Amino acid sequence: MNKQELLTNGRCKKKADRETVWPVVIMNFTGVYAHEVFARNNQFIWLDCRHLSGTRGYCDKEGIRKLKRVIAGYPAEGIHFIDSGNYHYLTKLWTDKLRVPFSLIVFDHHPDMQPPLFKGMLSCGSWVKDMLDWNMLCKKVVIVGASDKLIRTVPEEYGQRVSFYSEATLAHEKGWRNFSSAYIEGPVYLSIDKDVLNPASAVTDWDQGSFSLQELEELLAIVLRKERVVGIDICGECS
């Protein structure tokens, strides 16, 4: 499933006889999307974030307030392109808009559950932990494709709400059904960091995983068929 196919699947059924097309939002921090063909669509919403200082990797309270103002007029129910992995913490800001209990499925080579280096800062390495600590509507987090070494650093107290799975565990529909019935609660928000892919499939700013593009596409197709997905974001552009 390439970007265009993902956009084509960016629809949700409100009722059996009515389909709502999600907005596609591009958050422009580095200018990278200007060089990508898929983004040349005049129906996409471009949010210019290039003027915002103090947002790369780490974001303080003032930066968070500014970013919340930028996205205030747009729903979590959409497809959000959020630039490089340095801005993956934006998933927290988008999902804070959801008003129903949900599960978060993250495709990422990193668990993003480190304690922040600076108190009160939201970061690309701590945002999943922050979601679990502060968003009571986030019932479960599933992280797919994370490094085994990094998984071992996740504090044990999060074990009841966080699960880790490899592509091999889930890459068929029966496996997904069994997994979903045991671990997914409610609708699903999908967050994809392209560093889950191997270097032959994508170039990112971070160390990368072992998924091929085809493997990721196949698993995403299963999730989109089997779950009620209420929002999607994608990061991992090479800045």
PLM regions with names:
Residues 2-239:
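Conserved alpha-helical scaffold segments that buttress catalytic/binding sites
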